[in-house]
Amino acid sequence: MTKMNVESFNLDHTKVVAPFVRLAGTMEGLNGDVIKKYDIRFKQPNKEHMEMPGLHSLEHLMAENIRNHTDKVVDLSPMGCQTGFYVSFINHDDYEDVLNIIEKTLNDVLEATEVPACNEVQCGWAASHSLEGAKEIAQAFLDKRNQWSDIFGEGK
């Protein structure tokens, strides 16, 4: 397989076992700042996916709430394949802490009573949301917390 510019295109999606959180990239800026991008994979690639209303609400909830647990988040974005999200941190390289931040954020999702910015002024497709769908996705991921570090299903 020819090496491609996009990191995830070089990942053999048939070898990973979701759910997991993996370091997907590191970039150093000219002034020494380091950005680490993580792949938060909720669903098994090419086998299952998140339905868009739940995924969309999960995106809003995670993007808003993760910033309550750290000031190091640069961005949190859904994958187009609907199997996960990317989250990027600046000058933060503690993987276990990243897992804890994600866990706290998903617990916030379970406690939510509404989806933030779920209106036509603040959202580009406000009609496509499901708080219950987001909670179901979050709970399923949290239920397998002990597997998050085992990217290839090796029991590590």
Curated annotation (Swiss-Prot):
It is an enzyme of class 4 (lyase). GO terms for biological process: quorum sensing. One of its GO terms (molecular function) is iron ion binding. Pfam families: LuxS. Binds 1 Fe cation per subunit. The keyword Transcription does not apply. Fe cation binds at residues 56, 60, 123. It catalyses: S-(5-deoxy-D-ribos-5-yl)-L-homocysteine = (S)-4,5-dihydroxypentane-2,3-dione + L-homocysteine. InterPro entries: LuxS_sf, Metalloenz_LuxS/M16, S-ribosylhomocysteinase. Its cofactor is Fe cation. Keywords: Autoinducer synthesis, Iron, Lyase, Metal-binding, Quorum sensing. Gene3D superfamilies: S-ribosylhomocysteinase (LuxS). Its EC number is 4.4.1.21. Belongs to the LuxS family. Homodimer. Involved in the synthesis of autoinducer 2 (AI-2) which is secreted by bacteria and is used to communicate both the cell density and the metabolic potential of the environment. The regulation of gene expression in response to changes in cell density is called quorum sensing. Catalyzes the transformation of S-ribosylhomocysteine (RHC) to homocysteine (HC) and 4,5-dihydroxy-2,3-pentadione (DPD). This is S-ribosylhomocysteine lyase.
